[in-house]
Amino acid sequence: MRKQIGRLAVIALLVSACGSGSATATTPAGTVPGTVGGTVAGSTAPTTGLGSVGLFASALVEFNSCDAFLGHVKAEALERVGPYGLHGAGYAGPDVWDDVVLEVAVAEMAESAADAPTSVTAAPSPEPEAGVDYSTTNVQEIGVDEPDIVKTDGNRILVLSQGILYYVDVSSGLPDLLGWLDLWSWESQIVKDEDFWRYEMFLGSDSALLIAGGNGAVGDLTQVVQVDLSDPENLAATATLTVEGRYVSARLVGERASLVLVSRPHERIPFVYPASRSAEPRAEMANRVTIQETTLEDWAPSYVREDAGGASRGLFLDCASAYAPKEFSGFDFLSVLSLDMAGGIDIEAVSTVMSGGDTIYASSTNLYVATERWVDWFALDEEEAISEAETIRTYIHQFDIAGPDGVEYLASGSVDGYLLNQFAMSEHDGHLRVASTNDPSWGWWLRDGPSVSRVDVLAREGRDLRIVGSVGGLGEGEQIFAVRFIGEVGYVVTFRQTDPLYTIDLSDPENPRVVGELKIL
């Protein structure tokens, strides 16, 4: 396939160096709900005096029907499509000559579905012996479990290694391997013909929830497997759920798991590609026609659910729980899926925002997903690209994970700079504390400039996460290397040549202040 390589090469370097967040979408099993109309949620008024909350954070478009959602996506695509598709959003399609346009069929998700083993009635798991101590996964918040490859409740140890789940009984004080389940074996066919390389799990009272992330024939895939633990010598998968999308992470509160996925189904749209500059107008026209003819299935990720009763498939998107920023933020779909481990793998609740998703943090009631601001680098010249990259912002989406609906989108906000990891976020008394670093020299092509870090305190007002307090000027010329929040105190470590430790009093959310500083040479 011949490809034109021109000025896009420089922009491609910008994209690969800066990177942009991925995103995901979701829909519950069965039919997709829909009523006509779309509404604007939240206000657009920025917070004054404490830095901008960002237009992205306010005025999210809420869709009440699939027609409204599809119309929004197609309108955004028609505004941005060119002879090379959606600015290199993935598959480029076939060459287009001056007198012909080649058509390519859209790749579909593999439809093979092997019968899952019959479910076994689960027996209650043994309670750990009083006074017996055992280690658990290192978690950020008490009561909020995080996925791991080893889990224990004091009586049993589950180990997930290279696609095999091992059940070890330790109730007698000595380890006894009772059984295992091979996810890759031809007999089980739990993981089929895909390249899954990331495995994690949660341990519930009667079952284990295995989560696999990897690549399939149509891009990123996430597979969730529920394993019945009632008969350790005959472990059996009772249900599996395979979804188009990249697995970001998950959290477990009680028996309810919240999974975060980012999907890019738009990459499979069969845009054509010009074989010469004179063919560009024809290619752009063909790509516009392609967008106009797309359906919801072309833009939304799909899922396949399998259990002893057979397989079902559908779109992983609930249009009634889908949102898009008023400021366009890409065609990725950020999805939060709620699963009840006690009730099996049923797509009970899913909420979607058209945005990226990179870092997650959860309290016992709320889940936050952070991603760096999306920029259409291909639409910018060199000076515009430098200006955008010098003003790094991180956007944060808040979801309720404690309500009766399983998961519900609440609000969005933004802070200057980028986050180190999940520990850069912490919720306390209804406020979200966020530590970030703003580095104008981030990237080899940018101008020199001092980096500086800060801690912002955000509170929800309607659909907005607004900054109500800030403390800045932390470690000028340095970046954050470690963060911890403990109650009303925050600890931030920055580093370049020295290793400063800042102690921050957060007892007054509207007036955070540095109360201690230690520099280690």
Set out the residue ranges of the language-model regions:
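Bacterial N-terminal signal peptides that target proteins for export
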Residues: 1-8
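Beta-sheet-rich non-transmembrane sensory/scaffold domains
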Residues: 18-521
